[in-house]
Structure formats: structure tokens, C-alpha cells
């Protein structure tokens, strides 16, 4: 699933190409793509006609396009969603779900989604911040993110540090890949109890999270297959810089110990057994 760097890369591309453009027509080619829009596909298309995109913003892994009407288009890429800018004459993609045509002669915006886990909706009055995503915490790259608030909230939790990093109500945008990479840099195992971490240790980890996310944004994100691309259909390159994620049994880039792969929340965690030893005290299992 796209994480913050991938979604931010898409946001930057959209901001360059759709800001201040007026929507002339919207075609919904698959109703599942707008299933989160309760009023239905026809209403989705109708309410967007003749509106102008004012900006492109992001909260965690969600995008929204504020409109001059005061509403907003909210989007989530899911597992395979793509927002592509294409010339109007370009052939339709096999999994094209929604098409936005603009009043000028510039490229059209297409929502393509093979697995249809992603989707678009209109948030009434949501231009500043859609209510649908208001519960999601700010991300570590957000200028208004509070380090002190995060440290205090994290240390009150009785959970494992990796679970906390993936909790979108604590901080947003961090997924499995970048959590593993930040924990490796911080020399912390993902099962380390949060209530045992000192404030300075949490701040050091937060610094590594920011570094990993920032570096990944510069590389256009991480692409493991053809499903993640930017608005021009290009893949990201951060996978070449990964230190542990996806490198099971390969030598740790820091100490040479083979990287360990472990099951975690129906996915996999990657860590170095030497640099990131398991904690002696585990978080008690919930009853």
C-alpha cells in the first residue's frame, strides 16, 4: 500500500498540473471507485461539474482537492490506485475507473485502480479539512506536527513501538516499509515496549522517521511493482536505498548479520538480530 512518500509524490505532481483548473466533466466508469460517496456515482459527477481545483493537500495517506465551491474531492489510493495525467487522446487504461476532463486543453486526470481497494468521494464543505479524515493525526513532515505531544502520547501507550508507528491516530503516513527502516536506523526492535522508552529515545526515533520519509520523497517513493507510479506513470527509486525491508537473509548493511524476517500483523517485519535485539520485557498480550 502506498505510504507517505508515495502519496506525497503524487500530491506534488497533481498540484503542478490541476491547481486552478476548472472541471468540465467527470465520468465514473466503475461505481466501486466512488463507493464512499454515499449519494452515488451520478451525484459525484454532477456536484463536481464546473468547479475549480484550488489546491492539492495531503493528510497521512489521504489526498484531498479543495474546490472553489467549498467542497473537496477526497482520495485514497488503496493497494493499487493511481492518479494519472494523460492527454485526452491517450488510450484508456485497462483499469480506468474515473475520468476528470477540464475546461482547458491540458491533460485529463484519471483514477486507475486494478484492485479497486482505493476510491474517491466528495466531502461537503471539506475544503479546509474533510471531516472524513479529521481523525487522522498529522504526519512527521507536517510543520504543525508536535514532537512533545507525540512523545507524551507514545509513552502513555502500553504497546509495541512498531504498532505505535503504524497507529494513524498517533502519527500518520508511516507504513510497514518506513517503520522498519526507521527502527533499523534507531537500533530498536519493533516489539520494544513504548512505555519503556525515554523521551530522548523517542525523539531520536522520530528524527530517523523524518529522515527516512524525506529521503524517500526525494526518490519518488518506493516501487516494488508496476502498481505504484507517480502522475506521469513513473516508478520511485527508494527501494535501492532500503537497509532492511525486503532483505531477508541478506547481510545487514551496518554489521553484516543476516537480516531477519518475522511475521507481524498479517505481514512481515525485517530487522537485524545484532543491531536490533529483541527486548527482554514484552508487552503483555491483551485479553
Curated annotation (Swiss-Prot):
GO terms for molecular function: 8-oxo-7,8-dihydroguanine DNA N-glycosylase activity; class I DNA-(apurinic or apyrimidinic site) endonuclease activity; damaged DNA binding; zinc ion binding. SUPFAM superfamilies: Glucocorticoid receptor-like (DNA-binding domain), N-terminal domain of MutM-like DNA repair proteins, S13-like H2TH domain. A zinc finger (FPG-type) spans 243-277. It catalyses: Hydrolysis of DNA containing ring-opened 7-methylguanine residues, releasing 2,6-diamino-4-hydroxy-5-(N-methyl)formamidopyrimidine; 2'-deoxyribonucleotide-(2'-deoxyribose 5'-phosphate)-2'-deoxyribonucleotide-DNA = a 3'-end 2'-deoxyribonucleotide-(2,3-dehydro-2,3-deoxyribose 5'-phosphate)-DNA + a 5'-end 5'-phospho-2'-deoxyribonucleoside-DNA + H(+). It holds the Pfam family zf-FPG_IleRS. CDD domains: EcFpg-like_N (cd08966). The active site is at residues 2-3, 61, 267. Belongs to the FPG family. This is Formamidopyrimidine-DNA glycosylase. The gene is mutM.
